[in-house]
Amino acid sequence: MRRNGILSRLFLALVFLFLYAPIFVLIAFSFNDSKSNAVWGGFTLDWYRELLGNRAVLSALQTTLEVSILATIIATIVGTAAAIGFSSMKRRARNAYLAVNNIPLTNADIITGVSMMLLFVFTGQALADFSGWLNSQQWAADANLWFDFSFNLGFLTLLIAHITFDIPYVIVAVLPKIRQLDPNLAEAALDLGATRWTAFRKVVLPELMPGIVNGLLIAFTMSIDDFVISYFTAGSQVSTLSMVVYSMVRRRVSPEINALSTLMFVAVLLLLVVINLRQARQEASRKRQALRS
C-alpha cells in the first residue's frame, strides 16, 4: 500500500511537471536578456517595456478584452436562461435541444469559423441589396431618405461569433447545478409571500451561482484564447491578441511573445485565485449559517 502511494504521487508529480514545465520555461525566458530561446543571457525587463510600447499589441489587447468581456456577459446571461428553460422541458424535447447544443462543442473550430464567415458575408450582401431596393423606391426619394443596412466583417461580427460559441459552454456548466437544485426551495419561498423574481434572485440564483461562475470562466477563457473563429470573422480591420501573436510567430518567436504570454497567464491565474477564494468564503459562510440555524 505504501509503495503504491509513492508511485501514485510520483506519477501525479510527473503529470503536473509535463503540464506546467512549458509554462515555467516560457515565464523564465520572458526575462531573458538574450533574444535566444535556448540560451540564458541574464535577467532583464526590456521585453516587457518593448511590449508595453507596441501599439499593435496594445490595440489588439483592448479589442480582445472588449470582445471577451462583452461576449462573456451576454453568453452567461443567455446561457443561464437557456439552461433554466431546458430544465423545465419534457425529457424528449430537452434531450433534442441538448443534442443540438452539444454540436458546437464537438464541431471543429475551422468549420464553425468558415460557416459563420459565409453567414455574415451572405447576410451583409442581402442587407445591402435590400437597402438598394429601398433607396430605388420613389417614396424614399420623395422623402429624401437613404437606407444602408449593410455591414462588413469587423468588431460586430467578431462579437456575435464569440457569443455564439460561448453560449453552449455556459449551458453545459449551469445544467448540473439546476439538476441538483431542490424544486421545493422556490415553492417554499413563494408560499412565504415572495414574488417569483424575489424567489429566483434570493433562493434559486445563489444555488446556481457556482455553475454560473464556472460557465463564465470557461466562456471568458475560450473567448480570450480563440484564434480560428476570430481569424475568419474579424475581417481585415480588427485584430485580436491571438491573431497578433500568430503574425509575430510567423516571422520569428521573439521574447516579446514570451512576455505577452506570461502576462496573459498571470492575469487568468489571478482571476481564478480571486474567484476561488470568493467561493470558498461564501461556502464557509453558508456552513456557519447552517450550524447556527
Tell where the protein language model's regions lie, with residue ranges.
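C-terminal transmembrane helix and the adjacent membrane-cytosol boundary/short C-terminal tail
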Residues: 2-10, 134, 175-190, 200-202, ...
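Non-cytoplasmic
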Residues: 24-37, 116, 169-171, 211-246
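Periplasmic/extracellular loop-to-transmembrane helix junction in inner-membrane transport proteins
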Residues: 35-71, 250-251
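Membrane-interfacial helix termini and adjacent extracytoplasmic/periplasmic loops
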Residues: 36-41, 45, 50, 110-163, ...
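Interhelical loop and adjacent transmembrane-helix boundary motif
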Residues: 2-5, 48-56, 224-281
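Transmembrane alpha-helices
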Residues: 11, 16-23, 103, 107, ...
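Transmembrane-helix boundary motif in ABC transporter permease subunits
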Residues: 1-6, 70-101, 118-122, 273-280
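Hydrophobic alpha-helical transmembrane segments of multipass integral membrane proteins
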Residues: 58, 62, 66-78, 82, ...
